Amino acid sequence: MKKFIFFFKNYCYISGSMLLFSLIDLLLWIISLYCVGLVFWILFVLQCIYFVWWLWKNIFYQLNSFGLVNFVWDNPLSVIIGKLGTGKTLLLTYLSQTMKLLTDEIYSNYPLEDDKVKVLTFKNLDFTDRTKPVPPDDSVILFDESYLYIDGTSPHDEKKVHSGKIPWIVLARHFGNRALFTAQREGMIWNNIRQLASGIIIPISLKKPVIKKGFNFFNRFFIMQIGIFQDITDYEIWKTKSVERTAEGKRVKHKSDVGLGIRFFKIIIPLEFANKYDSQWLKFVRDLKNDEIVNKKEYYWSEITKLSVKERLELFDIDILKKNLKPKKEKGNGKDD
């Protein structure tokens, strides 16, 4: 039943993304009712071409959605790597909805407007912690901004602090957990996770809905192209070759290779999924700092000339200048004049 509901919803999303073309096809059909001869057959052929295109696209996107769900389910550890704005959190949120096809145990470390998604922190995965439990069998764990929790650029230092997470990382598949971690660079992900990850997901491009007055009904979908790799080494090789082709002025190839476990495909993400999370939910951290500041006076640059040199130096807070321009203590004379 879940698969049928998922298929039907996906069908509606995909059909909705092509609604404008469907209206054009309907218009052609209405016109053809009043035409005869060559014009009728031309319109008939155009309708047939549209129908074949619509059917192929619908099947194409349906298979891609099912393929992504199965890929995540088959890999206990996956990482999503992409620069700022490529849609990493959007993809996690999309999976928070589509993975319900296989399980009801969904956890995330960032807020989602979904009553079925549970809160998770890094302590849930720490075996030295005795306050929060490890998620049960068949759980999907969505972990955004992993760099905020573990500094992947300092693996040796982090290993001392986060050694309690290693048992979970190694035994995730035995626990029936499926986890996804995001980062802007592969080097930002902790080495213990990166090397054991059997799923590498790369958001390559993201076509956002264009918000225009009167056309919002036709622009309620994101189209994301992603690449999936089964090993970090395969991804690094592909990335190196892509950089070389770009440097030579050539187009980067997004060609799937089933033998190497490399696939590229597109998925449609409804705008309603994107509205389930706040991309700036961590802005409360700013308030933690600002609430402790007593003097919150701000200056305009036009007011700087009214300050003394010493006040300017204190205001700009340039440590090197403050250190070197600090008045030296005068040495006292050894004997009276």
From Swiss-Prot:
It comes from the Viruses. Its main location: host cell. It is a multi-pass membrane protein. Gene3D superfamilies: P-loop containing nucleotide triphosphate hydrolases. It is found in: Host membrane. InterPro entries: P-loop_NTPase. The chain crosses the membrane at residues 4-24, 26-46. Disulfide bonds: none annotated. The keyword Cytoplasm does not apply. GO terms for cellular component: host cell membrane; membrane. Keywords: Host membrane, Membrane, Transmembrane, Transmembrane helix. Belongs to the plectrovirus ORF2 family. This is Uncharacterized protein ORF2. It comes from Spiroplasma virus SpV1-R8A2 B (SpV1).
